[in-house]
Amino acid sequence: MAKDIITGRHTTFGNKRSHALNSSRRQWKANLHKVRILVDGKPKRVWVSARALKSGKLTRV
């Protein structure tokens, strides 16, 4: 499963509910992108969420 290395966001699971309160499983996927960033001074390709990219918490290589 892909997981953001900055914020830790990943796919979460839950129930989809109808008006009659019937339930079926569903999943919410985080908006993840595979980007190259500097990790320990070396370029590395990692999964990063769009929220982390927009906030400026990291710089692309």
From Swiss-Prot:
<keyword id="KW-0689">Ribosomal protein</keyword>
<dbReference type="InterPro" id="IPR034704">
    <property type="entry name" value="Ribosomal_bL28/bL31-like_sf"/>
</dbReference>
<dbReference type="InterPro" id="IPR037147">
    <property type="entry name" value="Ribosomal_bL28_sf"/>
</dbReference>
<dbReference type="GO" id="GO:1990904">
    <property type="term" value="C:ribonucleoprotein complex"/>
</dbReference>
<dbReference type="InterPro" id="IPR026569">
    <property type="entry name" value="Ribosomal_bL28"/>
</dbReference>
<dbReference type="GO" id="GO:0006412">
    <property type="term" value="P:translation"/>
</dbReference>
<dbReference type="Pfam" id="PF00830">
    <property type="entry name" value="Ribosomal_L28"/>
</dbReference>
<dbReference type="InterPro" id="IPR001383">
    <property type="entry name" value="Ribosomal_bL28_bact-type"/>
</dbReference>
<protein>
    <recommendedName>
        <fullName>Large ribosomal subunit protein bL28</fullName>
    </recommendedName>
</protein>
<keyword id="KW-0687">Ribonucleoprotein</keyword>
<dbReference type="GO" id="GO:0003735">
    <property type="term" value="F:structural constituent of ribosome"/>
</dbReference>
<comment type="similarity">
    <text>Belongs to the bacterial ribosomal protein bL28 family.</text>
</comment>
<dbReference type="GO" id="GO:0005840">
    <property type="term" value="C:ribosome"/>
</dbReference>
<dbReference type="InterPro" id="IPR050096">
    <property type="entry name" value="Bacterial_rp_bL28"/>
</dbReference>
